[in-house]
């Protein structure tokens, strides 16, 4: 209560101060006729009025909070504080929140017409604090350069440095004035945490932008002139990008410019607008500053497109639909809105998406700007282009650097980060971040880290870190963060408020509440000092070890020299013996015929390796003695296969043995299962069905059975180069899980084999094409979309029941069988061992289907599949994606911030399931609980579905594809099917070590279990 009373008193005092400013300004206006003075006084009055409005809102909220606590304490003293938040939702609180509800992006916070709010003050304080720290460092650099120029007596450079120093000093003055103003508006009691624009998981912290900026500088108003300037001053506006001036207006005495510039920008973060006052012919003095991040401008333009679309179409969000009770449950409702003409989007791409507004200058004044940014994007796709194919993306694996248990990965940060070791800013550069505890530092600093990671057990920490005797714990207390402060552990900026910020009362460092327990007990000692102590300890240990080694080696040097000489002689004799044996042994003996009835024989490791039929590969060797090319069979070891008898020598070969070409595998007798292995020569390729990053998918006929299969062909070279070996093995294991029950809605595996350059997955051929092709031809009815969703739901349920998450659910990966049922295909992004509450963090998926937690690079569960399932249902029902954009970044922004829109007459159960599946909080998402798919299956959207009939295919499909023959490929892209079904030659030669990565790949579904070579 005392804190609230003190806060109320402080707010009242600030309001009175602002009123005094207004009263004094009005009095001064009556005493002078100077228009420049009038203009300056007018701007002061306007700023004070805005401050009073903000402070009065805060005052009313504090009074309501005080009354709420008193009322709660009088009624129920034990729970009074808990009732406080609910009491604050009164008219005043709602009116206050409404002022900030129209803020779409950070660009709106720079708009002069945006009222002062906690969000706006927080954003500006963080921005100004950072700019001030950078400018102070810049001024120090100028001072150092000026001293160097003085030593060299370079007058021209000295004059230039002095000019820059004066400008920098003036900027620092302006920044301090602006900071003081916003600090004065801060109220200590503010209990609300406002998300920081630079905090972890920030929606707008994106990479630099490249494109064409078209900017029109209109006019200025209420700009404060520097002291001692005459009435006839000239103003100039300069546009800077990445510390370089890119454009400048002509001088103006009327504060009007109306000049348009087109600036080509490459990987630029922000544009700086500097308003100069021309003091003399040589000196321009800055009087107003503004920074606009290009990512904020891009986001604002994207939101304008969405707003235009909403106004033209009349679609609403689920919340508005429920609140306005516009949802009408009619059987024909969805069919009416599902017609193609009802889902046509207005052409927003061609509309004017320029952003025009009065933007606030710091510390005083406004500037009128009109801006439009067009990105240079080769993969640009109009928002209203409808559904289209998109490839999946996967974060490439990087090398892990371990230091004291920390597992550091290189990470590109696109926001302002502070190194946890040296305390300097990363400044949009690559840094190192621990996978487990998120400790963040420079690339140059991570080897110097002295803190132990939480993932490292205490008993294993016998390191120099344990030997630092400085053990003074920090005294962290809850801290009201106001301004720009960074976490001393993870390096992210702290949000405004009290809930998540902690500050040490002794040394003053700040941290997130969740990071406090990770901060080492080095109160009063910097990390750099601790690193110097560690360096001394290491140096001492190394010196002592070297001294001990020198003493021991001095006594044994003579004896060791003799032993080394003797052993080298033996090695030379052994090498000579091996050399003789090698040259006398024919190099083409592997081509000798293999006995049809081998007898078990113990073979030493130095002798010939036993031949296994499933792992024979062919190479071509030229022998000058024979005058011909002999096909050599490369043999691989199978630990469980029986050894073969030694084949006859080369002299016993009377006639050449017919063998397949280099690009085929050798089919021989499986010694364990007595069954013939599948190889490349057993198939006849008929057509190409599709292409991917690593290879092709081809239609082929198995000669012996006259059965059609789809063969996925992957190049070993690309698999190795992209570190996808384990992913390929995992894909095979997922196929085996699907094979276990021959699941009706999963593509099953017939067999897999390999050659020297490729691996092959022989899969079911699903001839009806994918759902993307069908939905592009015609809109799905409600029944058809519901039917496909039910079968896909059972496929996901089977995966989840076996601890597998799919992570690449989309229309492209759902194939339509000739009988009208669907099959889920492409298991390349699946992950195993993902049971309930198990998590992973790999950044992968198809952009439009990726869940928010994946985009935020958080640990996620199998509930990401249910988010993708919601996007899938939305696309099937409405023929468009709920989250759209012209490129990946815009799509990601839409996923993180936009609400899906629905036709006002869409059935209630359809809106309900989409709303519950597309919930951004993964813990509240439908299907995220331990019941998993059962919760989805019991939703009213599936109320008319008999799940047992669906699983056993007893439900009549709503659509049957028309096929002319079993080999008809009309439902596949003609771009691929018209190609010749041949494998392109591969010139690269893989080493034996490379080939070992693919050992045990062969498999056949005819076996009771995977082949004996299958260790994948």
UniProtKB/Swiss-Prot annotation:
Oligomeric and partner information: Interacts with rho2.
Record GO biological process: fungal-type cell wall biogenesis; intracellular signal transduction; negative regulation of glucose mediated signaling pathway; positive regulation of cell integrity MAPK cascade; regulation of actin cytoskeleton organization; regulation of cell wall (1->3)-beta-D-glucan biosynthetic process; regulation of establishment or maintenance of cell polarity regulating cell shape; regulation of fungal-type cell wall (1->3)-alpha-glucan biosynthetic process
Basic residues bias (residue ranges): 546-568
Record keyword Electron transport present: no
Ribonucleoprotein in keyword set: no
Protein name, UniProt field: Protein kinase C-like 2
Domain annotation Protein kinase: ranges: 683-942
List of residues binding ATP: 689-697, 712
Reactions catalysed: L-seryl-[protein] + ATP = O-phospho-L-seryl-[protein] + ADP + H(+); L-threonyl-[protein] + ATP = O-phospho-L-threonyl-[protein] + ADP + H(+)
UniProt-listed PANTHER family: RIBOSOMAL PROTEIN S6 KINASE
Record keywords: ATP-binding, Cell shape, Coiled coil, Kinase, Metal-binding, Nucleotide-binding, Phosphoprotein, Repeat, Serine/threonine-protein kinase, Transferase, Zinc, Zinc-finger
Annotated catalytic residues: 808 (proton acceptor)
Phosphothreonine modification, residue list: 984
GO molecular function: ATP binding; diacylglycerol-dependent serine/threonine kinase activity; lipid binding; protein serine kinase activity; protein serine/threonine kinase activity; zinc ion binding
Organism of this sequence: Schizosaccharomyces pombe (strain 972 / ATCC 24843) (Fission yeast)
Residues covered by the AGC-kinase C-terminal domain: 943-1013
Role description: Involved in the control of the cell shape. Target of the inhibitor staurosporine.
């Amino acid at each position: 209560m005392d804190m609230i009373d003190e806060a109320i008193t402080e707010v009242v005092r600030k309001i009175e101060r602002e009123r005094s400013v207004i009263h004094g300004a009005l009095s001064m206006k009556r005493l002078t006729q100077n228009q420049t003075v009038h203009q300056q006084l007018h701007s002061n009055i306007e700023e004070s009025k805005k401050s009073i409005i903000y402070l009065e809102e805060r005052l009313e909220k504090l009074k309501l909070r005080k009354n709420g606590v008193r009322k709660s304490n009088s009624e129920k003293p034990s729970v009074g504080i808990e009732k406080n938040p609910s009491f604050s939702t009164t008219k005043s609180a709602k009116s206050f929140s409404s002022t900030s509800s129209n803020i779409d992006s950070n660009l709106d916070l720079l708009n002069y017409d945006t009222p002062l709010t906690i969000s706006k003050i927080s954003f500006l304080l963080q921005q100004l604090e950072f700019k001030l720290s950078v400018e102070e460092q810049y001024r120090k650099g100028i001072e150092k350069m000026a001293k160097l120029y003085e030593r060299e007596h370079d007058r021209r450079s000295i004059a230039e440095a002095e000019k820059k120093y004066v400008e920098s000093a003036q900027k620092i003055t302006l920044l301090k004035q602006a900071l003081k103003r916003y600090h004065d508006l801060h109220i200590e009691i503010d209990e609300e945490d406002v998300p920081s624009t630079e905090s972890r998981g920030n929606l707008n912290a994106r990479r630099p932008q490249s494109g064409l900026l078209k900017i029109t500088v209109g006019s200025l108003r209420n700009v404060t002139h520097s002291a001692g300037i005459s009435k006839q001053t000239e103003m100039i506006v300069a546009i800077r990008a990445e510390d370089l001036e890119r454009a400048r207006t002509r001088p103006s005495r009327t504060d009007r410019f109306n000049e348009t510039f087109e600036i080509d920008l490459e990987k630029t973060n922000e544009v700086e607008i500097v308003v100069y006052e021309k003091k003399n012919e040589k000196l321009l003095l800055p009087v107003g500053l503004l920074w606009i991040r290009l990512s904020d401008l891009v986001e604002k333009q994207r939101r304008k497109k969405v707003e235009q679309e909403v106004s033209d179409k009349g679609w609403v969000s689920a919340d508005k639909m429920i609140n306005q009770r516009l949802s009408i449950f009619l059987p024909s409702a969805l069919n009416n809105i599902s017609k193609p003409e009802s889902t046509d989007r207005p052409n927003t791409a061609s509309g004017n998406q320029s952003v025009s507004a009065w933007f606030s200058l710091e510390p005083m004044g406004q500037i009128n700007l009109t801006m439009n940014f067009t990105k240079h994007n080769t993969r640009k796709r109009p928002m209203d282009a409808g559904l289209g194919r998109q490839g999946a993306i996967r974060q490439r694996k990087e090398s892990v650097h371990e230091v004291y248990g920390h597992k550091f990965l290189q990470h590109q940060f696109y926001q302002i980060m502070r190194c946890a070791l040296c305390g300097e800013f990363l400044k949009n550069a690559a840094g190192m971040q621990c996978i487990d505890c998120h400790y963040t530092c420079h690339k140059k600093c991570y080897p110097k880290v002295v803190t132990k990671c939480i993932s490292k057990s205490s008993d294993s920490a016998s390191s120099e870190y344990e030997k630092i005797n400085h053990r003074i714990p920090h005294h962290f207390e809850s801290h009201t963060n106001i301004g720009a402060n960074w976490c001393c552990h993870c390096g992210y900026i702290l949000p405004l408020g009290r809930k998540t910020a902690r500050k040490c009362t002794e040394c003053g460092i700040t941290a997130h509440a969740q990071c406090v327990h990770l901060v080492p007990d080095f109160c009063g000692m910097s990390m750099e000092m601790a690193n110097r102590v560690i360096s001394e300890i290491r140096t001492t240990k190394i010196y002592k070890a070297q001294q001990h080694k020198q003493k021991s080696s001095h006594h044994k040097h003579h004896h060791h020299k003799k032993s080394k000489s003797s052993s080298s002689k033996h090695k030379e004799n052994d090498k000579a013996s091996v050399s003789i044996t090698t040259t006398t042994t024919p190099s083409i003996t592997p081509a000798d015929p293999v006995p049809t009835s081998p007898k078990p024989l113990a073979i030493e490791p130095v002798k010939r390796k036993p031949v296994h039929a499933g792992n024979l590969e062919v190479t071509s060797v030229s022998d000058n003695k024979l005058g011909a090319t002999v096909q050599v069979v490369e043999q691989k070891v199978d630990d469980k296969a029986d050894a073969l008898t030694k084949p006859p020598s080369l002299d016993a070969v009377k006639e050449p043995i017919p063998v397949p070409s280099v690009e085929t595998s050798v089919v021989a007798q499986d010694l364990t299962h007595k069954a013939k292995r599948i190889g490349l020569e057993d198939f006849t390729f008929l057509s190409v069905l599709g292409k991917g990053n690593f290879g092709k998918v081809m239609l082929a006929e198995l000669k012996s059975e006259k059965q059609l299969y789809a063969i996925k062909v992957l190049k070993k070279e690309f698999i190795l180069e992209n570190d996808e070996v384990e992913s390929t093995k995992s894909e095979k294991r997922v196929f085996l899980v699907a094979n276990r029950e021959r699941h009706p809605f999963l593509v099953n595996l017939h067999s897999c084999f390999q050659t020297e350059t490729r691996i092959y997955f022989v899969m079911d051929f699903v001839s009806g094409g994918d759902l993307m092709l069908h939905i592009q031809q015609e809109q799905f009815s409600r029944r058809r979309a519901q039917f496909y969703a039910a079968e896909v739901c059972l496929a996901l349920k089977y995966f989840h029941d076996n601890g597998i998450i799919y992570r690449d659910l989309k229309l492209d990966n759902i194939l339509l069988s000739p009988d009208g049922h669907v099959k889920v295909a492409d298991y390349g992004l699946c992950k195993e061992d993902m049971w309930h509450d198990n998590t992973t963090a790999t950044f992968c998926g198809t952009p439009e289907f990726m869940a928010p937690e994946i985009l935020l690079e958080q640990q996620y569960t199998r509930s990401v599949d249910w988010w993708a399932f919601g996007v899938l249902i939305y696309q099937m029902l409405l023929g468009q994606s709920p989250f759209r954009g012209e490129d990946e970044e815009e799509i990601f922004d839409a996923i993180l911030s936009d609400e899906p829109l629905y036709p006002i007459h869409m059935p209630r159960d359809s809106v309900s399931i989409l709303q519950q599946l597309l919930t951004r909080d993964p813990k509240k998402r439908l299907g995220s609980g331990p019941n998993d798919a059962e919760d989805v299956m019991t939703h009213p959207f599936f109320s008319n579905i008999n799940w047992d009939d669906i699983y056993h295919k007893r439900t009549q499909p709503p659509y049957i594809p028309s096929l002319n023959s079993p080999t008809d490929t009309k439902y596949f892209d003609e771009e691929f099917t018209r190609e010749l079904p041949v494998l392109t030659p591969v010139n690269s030669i893989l080493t034996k070590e490379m080939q070992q990565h693919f050992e045990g790949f062969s498999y056949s579904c005819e076996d009771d279990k995977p082949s004996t070579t299958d260790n994948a």
